[in-house]
From Swiss-Prot:
Protein name: Peptidyl-tRNA hydrolase
Name of the gene encoding the protein in the UniProt record: pth
Subcellular location, record wording: Cytoplasm
Principal location class: cytoplasm
Classification via PROSITE patterns: PEPT_TRNA_HYDROL_2
Record text on subunit structure and interactions: Monomer.
Species in which this protein is naturally found: Polaromonas sp. (strain JS666 / ATCC BAA-500)
Keywords of the record: Cytoplasm, Hydrolase, RNA-binding, tRNA-binding
Family listed: Belongs to the PTH family.
Amino acid sequence: MIKLFVGLGNPGAEYEATRHNAGFWWIDALSRELQAPLTLDKSYHGQVARTTLNGKTVWLLKPLTFMNVSGKSVAALARFFKIAPDEVLVAHDELDIVPGQVKLKFGGSHAGHNGLRDIHAQLGTDDYWRLRIGVGHPGVKAEVINWVLKKPSQEHRVAIEECIDRALKAVPALLAGEMEKATMLIHTSQPPRPKPPRRTEPED
């Protein structure tokens, strides 16, 4: 079962609405859903909520360390409360998924995501769960940093918010350790992928 839910992002009003903060948006939504308000806890370098569900303690964590050193916050809380890596779920922005889609994944590469990279290093393993929230790709690698640190269009923001709401429906399964069920709930609730525009033949 998942005992620690983490949302990645950067602290500060200037980053609040940027694509890189999609993980923050999700953990805020989960906090509201569980009625577990996040409060600052300097021991864990972030905002923390603790709640009890079905007799079991569940933690929510929003690192305030800046994205590139998120692992410091995650590892501090996980180690103190003896939460194993495979009991951790990290919600983060994902370039390789279009806005409006979300994927659940266990383990694997950080794929260049600096927040995940630091969590890998601090936990000493990549064996934790990720909730990959699609924010789309600018199409050019050189534009990636600028892309994630900008606000999405209104259309994309709405699509991201909708997928965040859908992913919340899998939380009971995640808490119960029913990971196959959670995966199915998340992956089968996706909207259809937009079709590319049809090519029209030039008239004679």
